[in-house]
């Protein structure tokens, strides 16, 4: 929910190191800094961040919205096959929610999975899930489509506790 701050490590260094680690794991050559910076500028546009963010320490002094955008930027750069976004809508104003949601939607692919944890239906106004699962005491007690989220918003959780 609350991305950690990493004082002394710039976003650029963090992302470049992580990206090259992925390339190395895949048996590819590392990407030179100049090429990576060009690649990264395109990814910044996805989340509405300015290039100046790259020189700032990771999440240090970032607003809640900036931290969430930075998480989506990391997803855009690293292209994970599985991403877990825990309450990514927490603390976001409506503009930041829209930008973060657009980023998540653009990163959806047939070869990846995004697990999105939220307590509020408003995120689902922007991101249409394939499935909605309700957890209670560590177990999935109900599964459905986005209409399940609307029902939860309307009725709460009490009707599920049998």
Each model region followed by its residue ranges:
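ABC-family P-loop ATPase nucleotide-binding domains
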Residues: 1-79
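Walker B motif beta-strand of ABC-family P-loop ATPases
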Residues: 81-87
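Walker B catalytic motif
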Residues: 87-88, 95
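Conserved D-loop-proximal element of ABC-family nucleotide-binding domains
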Residues: 93-98, 143
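Helical "lid/switch" subdomain of P-loop NTPase nucleotide-binding domains
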Residues: 96, 120-123, 127-128
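Helical segment within the ABC ATPase nucleotide-binding domain
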Residues: 97-110
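Conserved H-loop
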Residues: 111-119
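Conserved beta-strand-loop-alpha-helix hinge in the C-terminal portion
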Residues: 126, 131, 135, 139-162
